[in-house]
Design a protein with these regions (language model features):
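Active-site loop/oxyanion-hole signature of alpha/beta-hydrolase fold enzymes
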Residues: 42-84
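Conserved dinucleotide-binding and phosphotransfer motif residues
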Residues: 39, 100-103
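Conserved HGGG/HGGXW glycine-rich cap/lid loop of the alpha/beta-hydrolase fold
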Residues: 8-55
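A conserved amphipathic alpha-helix that caps or lines the catalytic cleft of carbohydrate-
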Residues: 33, 73, 96-97
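Active-site acidic short loop of glycosyltransferases
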Residues: 11-13, 77-80, 101-102
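A short loop-to-beta-strand scaffold at the N-terminal edge of the catalytic core in hydrolase folds
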Residues: 1-8
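Flexible "cap/lid" loop of the alpha/beta hydrolase fold
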Residues: 94-98, 105-126
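Gly/Ala-rich beta-loop-alpha elbow adjacent to hydrolase catalytic centers
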Residues: 85-89, 93
């Protein structure tokens, strides 16, 4: 099992995973993460698969990215956390919340179009 790359800012028992948008990376949120960590959070700037310094794979769907986040949390032994998702990361975060709401304290969605897509859109990079 491959684990997503991340940079951590702050040192707290409260965790916030920041999930970037399409073609982005966790470091895009570094200045915000520094301010958030001042509010007693460890902020995880996560690079989704096929982005930043995370692994690359031909499988690239929202469902698989949700499982990548779950694997990341389990690997780091984080039982409860909050999610902030931007754009594509917002879609991934909402799907994560549908499947694993018991793991979440909060969910914050930034700048997405709330639309249900047809099934042929599920595989992002055909």
């Amino acid at each position: 099992m491959k684990i997503l790359h991340s940079n951590l800012i702050g040192n707290s028992d409260r965790h916030l995973f920041i999930i970037h948008g399409f073609l982005g990376m966790g470091d895009n949120w570094k200045s915000h993460a520094k301010k958030i960590s001042d509010n007693n959070y460890t902020t995880h700037l996560i690079d989704l698969r096929n982005h930043g310094r995370s692994f690359w794979n031909d499988e690239f769907t929202f469902d698989i990215m949700v499982e990548d986040i779950l694997n990341y949390a389990n690997f780091h032994k984080i039982e409860k956390f909050s999610l902030l998702g931007h754009s594509m990361g917002g879609n991934v975060s909402m799907l994560f919340a549908q499947k694993y709401s018991d793991l979440l304290e909060k969910i914050i969605i930034v700048d997405i179009i709330p639309k249900k897509y047809k099934p042929h859109h599920n595989n992002i990079m055909d």
